[in-house]
């Protein structure tokens, strides 16, 4: 347990290091803390903080920098978020395009990266495999294009190969049947109904429709579930730019998205803003990163998560506000878009 003096000095050290990225010495800390303490006293307190694993001395400097544990204590007990510095009115809602749900997600990721100057990530709302409309186009013998339109207006194209050939009139017949009987249903339900009704349909048409239902399910479920924006912002972060190996790993992380998806999925089960410092998430194995996330809702039900990814040396107060307000704006925009 830290006494008040140690807490004030740790808070001042973390804030100073976040501000300029330089190891903090005793003289600088004395000025930053506002405490009338001798350099020797401050050095003794810093030594105690170092023994507790809250700060560390880089090999190249006599100053100290916070550890992940030090940042955690700072975030949990020392933050004083100034709500008047950033408001929902400052982050303008119209840019979220509430009448276009797909743009809400991509615009939110861009807003997060633009406001934070780090990386913005948004996990798209969990999708159920539902189609709104389906069409077939004959490309060549036994080769057809399936055009699938999802409920949110996204269009996916898939090529299928069949054992039998079909005329364009047969393709129209199949698409009309699927659209009139099954549009808006879950793909699994469509598959079951087709299985039950296959005897009432002509065999070759039933086979075509079953193939179409399968590729529709794969197309809808394979869409990117995480939107990432602002990866290049990390090139300007000195904590990363000096280590090209780490940068490559980070860009791989953003490109592959699987680890991001797992982290955001876990975060969606928590209430409010969550902060992962260093390796705390146990999902993203990068000690130098911090992630600030918050879930968003549609009509009161959590459907996804968004957040900011940046260095441990980030202004946490500002990031918390950006993520919190953006999640509320996204929730409002998506709820109004229905």
UniProtKB/Swiss-Prot annotation:
GO MF terms here are:
DNA binding
* InterPro entries on file: GAF-like_dom_sf (IPR029016), HrcA (IPR002571), HrcA_C (IPR021153), WH-like_DNA-bd_sf (IPR036388), WH_DNA-bd_sf (IPR036390), WHTH_HrcA_DNA-bd (IPR005104), WHTH_transcript_rep_HrcA_IDD (IPR023120)
**Which keywords, in A-to-Z order, does the entry hold?**
Repressor, Stress response, Transcription, Transcription regulation
One Pfam annotation reads HrcA
What processes in GO biological process is this protein linked to?
negative regulation of DNA-templated transcription
Task: Give the similarity note.
Answer: Belongs to the HrcA family.
Q: Which NCBIfam families does the record cross-reference, listed alphabetically?
A: hrcA
PANTHER family attached here? HEAT-INDUCIBLE TRANSCRIPTION REPRESSOR HRCA
- Which HAMAP family does its entry note? HrcA
UniProt function note: Negative regulator of class I heat shock genes (grpE-dnaK-dnaJ and groELS operons). Prevents heat-shock induction of these operons.
What is the protein's given name?
Answer: Heat-inducible transcription repressor HrcA
Organism placement in taxonomy: Bacteria, Pseudomonadati, Pseudomonadota, Betaproteobacteria, Burkholderiales
């Amino acid at each position: 347990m830290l006494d008040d003096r140690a807490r004030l000095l740790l808070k001042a050290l973390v804030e100073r290091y976040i501000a300029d990225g330089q190891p903090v010495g005793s003289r600088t800390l004395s000025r930053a803390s506002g405490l009338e303490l001798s350099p020797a006293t401050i050095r003794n307190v810093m030594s105690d903080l170092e023994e507790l694993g809250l700060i560390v001395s880089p090999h190249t400097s006599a100053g100290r920098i916070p550890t992940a544990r030090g940042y955690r204590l700072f975030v949990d007990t020392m933050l004083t978020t100034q709500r008047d510095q950033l408001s929902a009115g400052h982050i303008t809602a119209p840019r979220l395009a509430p009448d276009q749900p797909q743009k809400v997600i991509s615009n939110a990721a861009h807003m997060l990266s633009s406001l934070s100057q780090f990386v913005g990530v948004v996990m798209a709302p969990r999708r159920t495999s539902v189609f709104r409309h389906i069409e077939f186009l004959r490309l060549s013998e036994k080769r057809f294009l399936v055009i699938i339109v999802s409920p949110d207006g996204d269009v996916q194209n898939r090529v299928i190969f069949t054992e039998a050939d079909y005329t364009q009139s047969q393709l129209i017949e199949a698409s009309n049947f699927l659209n009139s009987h099954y549009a808006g249903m879950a793909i699994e339900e469509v598959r079951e109904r087709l299985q039950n009704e296959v005897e009432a349909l002509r065999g070759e048409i039933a086979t075509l429709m079953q193939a179409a239902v399968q590729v529709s399910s794969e197309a809808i479920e394979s869409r990117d579930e995480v939107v990432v924006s602002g990866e290049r912002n990390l090139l300007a972060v000195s904590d990363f730019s000096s280590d090209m190996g780490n940068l490559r790993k980070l860009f791989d992380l953003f490109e592959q998205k699987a680890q991001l998806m797992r982290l955001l999925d876990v975060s969606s089960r928590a209430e409010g803003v969550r902060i992962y410092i260093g390796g705390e998430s146990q999902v993203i194995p990068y000690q130098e990163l911090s992630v600030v996330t918050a879930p968003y809702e549609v009509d009161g039900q959590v459907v996804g998560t968004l957040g900011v990814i940046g260095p441990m040396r980030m202004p946490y107060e500002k990031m918390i506000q950006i993520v919190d307000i953006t999640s509320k704006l996204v929730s409002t925009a998506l709820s109004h878009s229905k």
